[in-house]
UniProtKB/Swiss-Prot annotation:
Keywords: Cytoplasm, FAD, Flavoprotein, NAD, tRNA processing
Gene assigned in the entry: mnmG
PROSITE patterns: GIDA_1, GIDA_2
Coiled-coil ranges per UniProt: none
Cofactor requirements of the protein: FAD
GO molecular function, one term: flavin adenine dinucleotide binding
This protein's name: tRNA uridine 5-carboxymethylaminomethyl modification enzyme MnmG
Listed SMART domains: GIDA_assoc_3
Tagged with keyword Flavoprotein: yes
Residues holding FAD: 12-17, 124, 179, 369
Subunit structure, as described in the record: Homodimer. Heterotetramer of two MnmE and two MnmG subunits.
Length: 642
């Protein structure tokens, strides 16, 4: 392996690393994945599930762009559930329980069977840099591997430290050593390196649980798979999850031992995830609550391990034993592995571009938890984008950037690059200002053409997508053009639904806009629907919410005006009158690409945006008077001229 050359080197084999490798290799680039443990490829370090609110949206987006996660999630699903099914379409989300061992195996096989991709077990100790250009990596044995682009996807492993009570151990998760050297080198190069914290709950033995004291939680019978390539018939047997709750006794034990928690005695300095708090955090922040729910989730079909969702903890083992036994159903529980916390390094993400290349070192890309995110889906989305852009940088293609109005992936990356993060970033539907047009059901309509243009979606797969879109259009046209007359028989059927009688002839589209009607009611009126729910549901939503969608699209058009106003690379913020020192510092730090991005920077007020616009207009007038010299590409002059 010594002195071997590749196009793209990917460091790490988690969810970000997998998508980065596959996208690069599928675009024809000679790609190498380096991981410390090939047995842990695609390993689910925490919860054995994929998707959720907003997260499920991103899994579908990854899939339509040619990524891998959706297929793997469908293939290894052991329970399917649609969250918020009774709420509006913008906030519904798909979540699947997975067999974590089969998931890892499926992803590993995908990597080993992918042309243009090699997998190497080894540890990357440092980068090979030629001034500000990354040209490869050095392994622990001293061998050098050269690459035209390098992607770091190290997850929680950079200077990772595990905490159980007051005991500490080096590692990014149980059974795996930390990555030492990379973050120190980046810090020496000038990167702002910070610490974050995450945690995981205990794993319990199935036979030690009294299931009669818990509440079964079944999955959904109707399945909308993540991938357009998957069947709606799940391949694996479906299992139950179970619900139970903590008690006041549970909380008393935890409160009485907070002095033994590394989070509460000052040992852990990193900030933990706000939206996935430990049980210590829950009973402290929500002291008025007498109980918290927890779900018992099987980790697979051939394992006895149960994941205790919602009870992440880093308390000592004896304390965990005591408080677990106060939870109904767990009175005699046996713990296979205790919960623990992990503290790790991350790079402040305002130091990267939207293409996920670092601003300081060329041809070095970052993806996943190294950028301050939390979650498999967030990591996979970044891995896909980093892999595409690393490949494009070598192939001479333009950077691939998704807008906030195009995808949740675009919202996430823009948030990270523009605002940074001080805590593990998790995706929510509330983060997207255009969420009504970023639904799960219309992902194909939003992104399939882009996926084909990128080259990650095969001709055969694109034909499936095209067929699906055409069938949706046919159905929508039939709804628009088929008229229903208010005959006696029709009025009688409407009364049974019930819905008000028709006072005049209506198209089926007009009728479907009634809030009490669903597409299934149309069949009572002899309207033939497509048998595929993936055809019917998106059309029904478009019809019912057409007015809201139109208003959202109008807002997008308005916001795009600011997004299309490019800011020059050499813009001297220090010279702009009307900007506060804080605003100047933040603008210089982020270096926004557009005026739209500038207005999203925390601490930059609307008055600052006006000041920038006035400055640029004034600069343009000076130039038109011939009072300024010529400048190079990317300068204020060239952009204003553009």
């Amino acid at each position: 392996m010594a002195n071997k050359k590749y196009d793209v080197i990917v460091v790490g084999a988690g969810h970000a690393g997998i998508e980065a490798c596959l996208s690069s290799a599928r675009l024809g680039l000679n790609t190498l994945m380096v991981t410390t443990n090939t047995d842990r490829i695609g390993y689910m370090s925490c919860n054995p599930s994929i998707g959720g609110l907003a997260k499920g949206h991103m899994v579908r987006e990854i899939d339509v762009l040619g990524g891998q996660m959706g297929v793997a999630a469908d293939e290894t699903c052991i329970q399917y559930k649609r969250l918020n099914a009774s709420k509006g379409p913008a906030v519904r989300g798909t979540r699947v329980q997975n067999d974590k061992h089969l998931y890892s195996q499926f992803q590993k096989e995908a990597l080993y069977n992918q042309p243009n991709l090699e997998v190497l077990q080894g540890e990357v100790k440092r980068l090979i840099l030629e001034k500000d250009l990354c040209v490869g990596v050095v392994l622990q044995d001293g061998s050098e591997i050269f690459g035209k682009a390098t992607i770091i996807t190290t997850g929680t492993f950079m200077n990772g430290v595990m905490h159980i009570g007051l005991r500490q151990e080096a590692g990014g998760r149980v059974g795996d050593q930390p990555s030492i050297g990379l973050s120190d080198q980046l810090a020496q190069f000038g990167f702002e390196v910070k610490r974050l914290k995450t945690g995981t709950p205990a794993r319990l033995l199935k036979d030690s649980i009294d299931w009669s004291k818990t509440i079964p939680q079944a999955g959904d019978e109707k399945v909308y798979p993540f991938s357009f390539r998957s069947s709606d018939k799940l391949k694996l047997p479906q299992v139950l999850c179970y619900l139970t709750r903590t008690t006041e006794e549970t909380h008393d034990i935890i409160r009485g031992n907070l002095d033994k928690s590394p989070m509460y005695c000052g040992i852990i300095e990193g900030v933990g995830p706000r939206y996935c708090p430990s049980i210590e955090d829950k009973i402290t922040r929500f002291a008025e609550r007498t109980s918290h729910q927890t779900f018992l989730e099987p980790e697979g079909l051939s394992t006895d391990l149960i994941y205790l969702q919602g009870i992440s903890t880093s308390l000592p083992e004896d304390v965990q034993d005591r408080f677990l036994k106060t939870i109904p159903g767990l009175e005699n529980v046996k713990v296979a592995r205790y919960g623990y916390a992990v503290e790790y390094d991350y790079i402040e993400p305002t130091q990267i571009w939207h293409r996920l290349e670092t601003r300081t070192i060329r041809q070095l890309f970052l993806a996943g938890q190294i950028n301050g995110t939390s979650g498999y889906e967030e990591a996979a989305a970044q891995g896909l984008i980093a892999g595409i852009n690393a490949a494009h940088s070598i192939l001479g293609r333009e950077e691939f950037i998704l807008g906030r109005d195009q995808a949740y992936m675009g919202v996430m990356i823009d948030d990270l690059v523009t605002k940074g993060t001080r805590e593990p970033y998790r995706m929510f539907t509330s983060r997207a200002e255009h969420r009504l047009v970023l639904r799960e059901d219309n992902t194909i309509d939003r992104l399939s053409d882009l996926g084909r243009k990128l080259g990650l979606v095969s001709a055969e797969s694109f034909e499936l997508l095209t067929n699906l879109r055409e069938r949706r259009q046919v159905l929508h046209d039939r709804l628009k053009n088929t008229v229903l007359y208010p005959t006696k028989d029709i009025q009688a059927i409407l009364a049974t639904i019930p819905t008000p009688a028709m006072s005049k002839s209506l198209t089926f589209e007009e009728l479907l806009r009634r809030p009490e009607l669903t597409s299934s009611h149309l069949e009572l009126l002899n309207f033939e629907l497509d048998p595929d729910p993936n055809v019917v549901e998106p059309v029904e939503i478009e019809v019912k919410y057409s007015g809201y969608v139109k208003r959202q699209m109008d807002l997008i058009v308005q916001s795009k005006r600011l997004e299309e106003m490019l800011l020059p690379d050499d813009l001297a913020y220090a010279e702009i009158r009307g900007l506060s020192n804080e605003e100047k510092d933040k603008l210089l730090r982020v270096k926004p690409r557009t005026l739209g991005q500038a207005q999203r920077i925390s601490g930059v007020n609307p008055s600052a945006i006006q000041a920038i616009m006035i400055h640029l207009k004034g600069h343009k007038k000076i130039k038109e008077m011939g009072l300024e010299g010529q400048s190079g590409a990317g300068s204020t002059d060239s952009i204003l001229a553009h």
